[in-house]
Amino acid sequence: MKLLEERILKDGHILGDNILKVDSFLTHQVDFSLMREIGRVFAEKFAATGITKVVTIEASGIAPAVFTAEALNVPMIFAKKAKNITMNEGILTAQVYSFTKQVTSTVSIAGKFLSPEDKVLIIDDFLANGQAAKGLIQIIEQAGATVQAIGIVIEKSFQDGRDLLEKAGYPVLSLARLDRFENGQVVFKEADL
């Protein structure tokens, strides 16, 4: 997605060897016009697949997932990272390691929001090592629902997340694919959408 790549080049900041900071439009402050376009692009791609739910993980996946779900006219569910006393029965959980935060969290979704009839589109802000998507897949499959595809806003193609997910049989479609960081600049691979 050219608009996203241009925004990454303009406002993204490289930290170290493998971190891209995009807090001015995605991971802290949210550019709603960009998120609306991201949602439109994902929805256009998946409109004919019968998606019934969009699932993400808090926090930075919520904005692109909301706009995708809105464009598809289906509910969006986000997995919670913190235990909530109001979520006390029928909870589906998985362990997820965060590459950026370098911590493992138990993420959860109330089972009443997913059913075996659901066809789920996972949307997330970043794909690095695939652990967030893997955890969401475990939760979705605990409910007996089907993962149709995984939509990623920014993929770090130099890490193994895509390979892990595709080898497990899940299609991955990314709007921006980072090939590498070179001389303080992002070098892109051809995106899927």
From Swiss-Prot:
GO terms for biological process: purine ribonucleoside salvage; xanthine metabolic process; XMP salvage. Keywords: Cytoplasm, Glycosyltransferase, Purine salvage, Transferase. It is found in: Cytoplasm. It catalyses: XMP + diphosphate = xanthine + 5-phospho-alpha-D-ribose 1-diphosphate. Pathway: Purine metabolism; XMP biosynthesis via salvage pathway; XMP from xanthine: step 1/1. The keyword Transferase applies. Its EC number is 2.4.2.22. One of its GO terms (cellular component) is cytoplasm. One of its GO terms (molecular function) is xanthine phosphoribosyltransferase activity. Its main location: cytoplasm. Xanthine binds at residues 20, 27, 156. The keyword Phosphoprotein does not apply. 5-phospho-alpha-D-ribose 1-diphosphate binds at residues 128-132. Homodimer. Belongs to the purine/pyrimidine phosphoribosyltransferase family. Xpt subfamily. Converts the preformed base xanthine, a product of nucleic acid breakdown, to xanthosine 5'-monophosphate (XMP), so it can be reused for RNA or DNA synthesis. PANTHER family: HYPOXANTHINE/GUANINE PHOSPHORIBOSYLTRANSFERASE (PTHR43864), XANTHINE PHOSPHORIBOSYLTRANSFERASE (PTHR43864:SF1). HAMAP family: XPRTase. This is Xanthine phosphoribosyltransferase.
